[in-house]
Amino acid sequence: MPEVSLYNYTMSICSMKTRLAMEEFGVDYDDKQVDIGFALENFEPDYVRLNEKAVVPTLVVGDRVVTNSYNIVLEAAKLGKVGIPADPVENKAALDWFQKGDQVNFQVITYGHKGVPRGDELLIARRERAKEYAEKYPELRSIYQAAHDRIVEHGNCAYDADTVAQAEVDLQKRLDELDAHLADKPFIAGSNYSIADIMWTVLLARIEMLNMTAWISERPNLLAYYQRMKARRSFETARVMPNWKGGI
């Protein structure tokens, strides 16, 4: 297997998904931390040349670069040759629920619930850094300008009450559906752990981090499932965080 490096940040929800995939699917990797807090390391030129969106995570496999946690989890399953069931029914369930989790707007929910310490200040700092670097590095201006515009749009959405409320409604519908789905299954796809469990273990941990645990505990099948996932060794080794740790 070629050398594998994962650029990530401990408290990033998307980074947690990829670390959990690496641990569960048995992929050895070099853990490269990129501080996306006030250090703003994700805006440094060397990093944006790897990931033009200036976000984490980023996976490098040999000379290939894979961005977006969705793609990285799939790549980890491919490298580990596990996580995507061969059985057609379980395969469909794994992919369907993996996609359903990815569609939930947890970024808006997290910032809307003030889940990131000094989150308001951080968004301003990111916006200003992108603007500054667009002038400082003219060869990368279009990348930094696009990053600036995404940060502005994210801030507008994250602090719009209607947008946050709709994201919460969408999430609760998914949780109801998943609770019913888990009535007779140890894992989301069925009898085998899959990419769907990667996705939802991390999303449920984020719900806990946001002090919204009632959304889990009031759904008995979901609660039992989450407890099983938390008991897996990978939950700790992948640093899936149900509570905020450290600064920003």
UniProtKB/Swiss-Prot annotation:
It catalyses: 2,6-dichlorohydroquinone + glutathione disulfide + chloride + H(+) = 2,3,6-trichlorohydroquinone + 2 glutathione; 2,3,6-trichlorohydroquinone + glutathione disulfide + chloride = 2,3,5,6-tetrachlorohydroquinone + 2 glutathione. Induction: Constitutively expressed. It comes from the Bacteria. Pfam families: GST_C_2 (PF13410), GST_N (PF02798). InterPro entries: Glutathione-S-Trfase_C-like, Glutathione-S-Trfase_C_sf, Glutathione_S-Trfase, Glutathione_S-Trfase_N, TCHQD, Thioredoxin-like_sf. Optimum pH is 6-7. One of its GO terms (molecular function) is glutathione transferase activity. The keyword Transferase does not apply. Homodimer. Belongs to the GST superfamily. This is Tetrachloro-P-hydroquinone reductive dehalogenase. It comes from Sphingobium chlorophenolicum.
